[in-house]
Design a protein with these regions (language model features):
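Classical Sec-dependent N-terminal signal peptides that target proteins to the secretory pathway
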Residues: 1-21
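Transmembrane beta-barrel domains of bacterial outer-membrane proteins
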Residues: 19-257
């Protein structure tokens, strides 16, 4: 039954008609998956293998583009080294660039990998990513480094930075670093699980191409319902406030523990 539910959802996701600000969802969701996996260990919610799988369909509306997408991801502990967690996410997006005012939908493909090491109450996370876009002929390379500390078993405070190098075929490349600090908390109540977080982040320079401020406040709220003891249905909202715009993301998905 669980396999049938996941298969039906994945088919529906491909034809989703909702919209999203792709770059904010893809990178943040993977990092949250690593953080959440470590919080689950602290709270005793992980299953025997310590593995987590997700499938998400997400949608929203940003200032510069409308997109619709699907993401799958997984994390797992190393059997011999339970304090080490590795994860990977794969995302496919279709996006429509608003300033063009056309009906053309471009496509974007993303792969991100993450590794974390937990030492007592401290967590170190390293991430690498690759992104390719067909419409604007862009290749992106992403690196993440994060350090955090568990204030309690279910509350995680972190800081770090993300570097991006975007290579465009017919225009100038774009390189920047984004610095961040945030907090994430997870709670449970009966058959529900709640994840809430807020993050402050700032780029090291102002984009010349985009009408946006350097600083952002991003918050995420996810409510999950236990269909089975190892399968959850997720509803998510993500918002990003910039001095010149507000982007929002809505997502539906499933999480599976084993």
């Amino acid at each position: 039954m669980k396999k049938i539910i996941l298969l039906m959802f994945s088919v529906l996701c491909v034809n989703s008609f909702s919209y999203v600000e792709r770059s904010e969802q893809v990178g943040n969701r993977g990092l949250e998956l690593i953080r959440e996996s470590n919080i689950n260990q602290n709270m005793g919610l992980s299953k025997e293998s310590g593995s987590t799988q997700i499938i998400d369909a997400y949608g929203g509306n940003g200032k510069f583009s409308k997109t619709k997408g699907l993401m799958i991801g997984t994390t797992s502990n190393f059997v011999a080294y339970p304090n080490i967690t590795a994860g990977v996410t794969v995302a496919y997006d279709k996006y429509k660039y608003k300033p063009d005012n056309s009906d053309y939908w471009g496509r974007n493909y993303d792969v991100n990998t993450y590794f974390s090491y937990k030492l007592d109450k401290n967590l170190f996370t390293l991430g690498f990513g690759y992104s390719q876009s067909r419409h604007v002929e862009k290749r992106g390379y992403i690196g993440n480094l994060e350090f955090g500390r568990f204030l309690t078993g279910n509350t995680y405070l972190y800081t770090g930075f993300e570097g991006q190098n975007r290579n465009y075929r017919n225009s100038e490349d774009l390189k920047f670093i984004n610095y961040k600090v945030g907090v994430l908390r997870q709670d449970t109540w009966k058959k529900f699980k709640f994840l809430n977080g807020i993050e402050f982040n700032m780029d090291n320079k102002k984009y010349d191409r985009e009408d946006r401020g350097r600083g952002n406040i991003t918050f995420v709220s996810r409510a999950s319902y236990y269909i089975y003891d190892d399968l959850l249905f997720d509803v998510q909202y993500r918002g990003t406030k910039n001095s010149k715009f507000y982007n929002n993301v809505v997502g539906l998905g499933f999480t599976h523990y084993f």
